[in-house]
């Protein structure tokens, strides 16, 4: 398009959404949006739970990232995002909370725990998504998903938002 900006969209969150799009267009939501040229300048998907192989190929080719929202997807019974598959295919994954209407707790530590825990159960593999990958999803990849390119490391001249974590709190002691 004339604006040459990335497009970000809630997409492929529920099976029903994907089925209805296939019925109306003959394509998945990702394929349909791609056919309209919406991903010519990159962008991202929020949720990305129900995809087929062609969807992954489009995302990889068009440099589309995904923001997974595990607590929201659990609350709304949307499904579990294929995070391990995204990582294996080299598609950047960030972690989000979706919002208070679909997630009762906007706690990123909870989201991080859910990302890794759900993938372990789905793949029956305690190392399905390593902790280092989850930390990257919650930090650097979040910045990437928002189009921020000057906050990937702690260094002079780079931007940074920092938090302090009380390691004496029981729930944070595993940090």
Residue ranges of model-derived segments:
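Histidine/acidic residue-rich metal-binding segments in metalloenzymes
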Residues: 1-65, 77-93
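Residue-level marker of alpha-helix boundaries and capping positions
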Residues: 46, 73-74, 130
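Nucleotide-sugar donor-binding loop of glycosyltransferases
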Residues: 11, 70, 166-168
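Short beta->alpha connector loops
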Residues: 48-52, 72, 148-149
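Short, charged, surface-exposed secondary-structure boundary motifs
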Residues: 75-80, 104-106
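His/Asp/Glu-enriched, well-ordered alpha-helical/loop segment
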Residues: 35-42, 84-168
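Short, acidic/turn-prone active-site loops that include or flank metal/cofactor-
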Residues: 13, 70-74, 99-101
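Conserved small/polar residues in nucleotide/adenosyl-binding loops
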Residues: 172-174
